[in-house]
Design a protein with these regions (language model features):
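Structural signature of beta-strand start/N-cap positions in the alpha/beta core
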Residues: 67, 95, 132-134, 155-158
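N-terminal signal-anchor transmembrane helix
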Residues: 30-66
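Active-site loop/oxyanion-hole signature of alpha/beta-hydrolase fold enzymes
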Residues: 88, 98-136
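Flexible "cap/lid" loop of the alpha/beta hydrolase fold
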Residues: 146-185
Length: 186
């Protein structure tokens, strides 16, 4: 009886491994066929190298005008395309720079922990590339911008926050379990 149970368990474990392997192969195949995303905004496109990642950004307007950095919100479809309807109007009077945050839009998406600290560091470093830019930030990114400014990573000449939210809240329980479950399959 015990031998039969062991065989059954091993058989189901084999099926599970086979299914997991098929899922990984399908995911890689779909990723390879997806191709690159088109830049969401009109303008000049470039990338900013940050911590080994290529961070896509778009520039519009006269570079001699006041720089306005537009930081999009964090959501399932987040990208600098959030500013699509207003970038031309903003570029009439400003040098607009709109990055796609790490893991969003046309920017790299390496398998790492995307946290508030990561985005605060990125925003601080990116804004420091410009001489006291004006900053427009929406949603949760407004919190990242204000944290970077508060830490003194950079200065801003003006700040506009659209629907700002806070990063606060309780830490999730059992973070070690969450990290284990989110680890890539090898």
């Amino acid at each position: 009886m015990a031998l039969e149970r062991l065989r059954s368990t091993l058989r189901y474990a084999g099926y599970g491994l086979l299914a997991a392997g098929a899922a990984v192969a399908a995911s890689r195949g779909l990723r390879a066929r997806a191709g690159k995303l088109e830049p969401p905004l009109s303008g000049d496109h470039d990338s900013y190298r940050w911590r080994g990642m290529d961070i896509h950004y778009t520039e519009a307007g006269d570079p001699d005008d006041q720089t306005l950095v537009c930081v999009h919100g964090i959501n399932a479809a987040g990208s600098s395309g959030e500013f699509r309807e207003i970038v031309a109007d903003l570029a009439a009077d400003h040098h607009v720079v709109a990055p796609d945050l790490p893991g969003f839009g046309c920017s790299d998406r390496p398998p790492l922990r995307y946290s508030a600290a990561l985005y605060e560091d990125f925003v601080g470093d990116f804004l420091a590339e410009y001489d006291e830019p004006a900053v427009l930030a929406s949603s949760l990114s407004a919190s990242y911008v204000t944290s970077a400014l508060e830490r003194g990573d950079t200065d801003a000449s003006r700040l506009a926050l659209i629907c700002p939210t806070a990063t606060g809240g309780p830490e999730p329980p059992k973070t070690w379990l969450r990290e284990l479950l989110r680890a890539p399959v090898l």
